[in-house]
Amino acid sequence: MEIVSEDVAWQNFERLAAFIFEKNDFRVTVNTVKTDHKKRRQYDIIARRSNQTFLVECKKWAGSRNRLSALKKAVEQHTERTAFYNTITREDAIPLLVTLVEEEIQCYEGVPLVPVLRLNAFIHELDKDADRNSFRDYEDDMDIPDDVPWPEKE
């Protein structure tokens, strides 16, 4: 599946992630735009089931030397988009990045980075645990190499 994912356009990569959510009984919208006071944010996937909403950012990057730095920036931007969404909808949506390949990190600043091949298993694990706060614990338990180029927070 990873080889197939590499060859598809990014829009189809998003549809694959949306399909996995749909197969797990989520109501899914793709490429949704929300606006408020002239601010505009786009969401690759919004997946809802019961009282749970995921805001999914799909990143189909592979082989980049600066991929880890780019992922960190993507997490920061997606965290801001999630805060915007939560403010205008009064929901408590969960940010999630879906990647093409397994990354050196699995969670950054409480945001899971899940390879598309493991998305179904990730959803099933959430069904068992049903605790979004475990993302932070998951991050704290990780052994992140010292040479990972994460710039300091400002």
What are these language model-derived features?
Residues M1-E154:
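Intrinsically disordered, low-complexity Ser/Thr/Pro/Gly-rich regulatory segments
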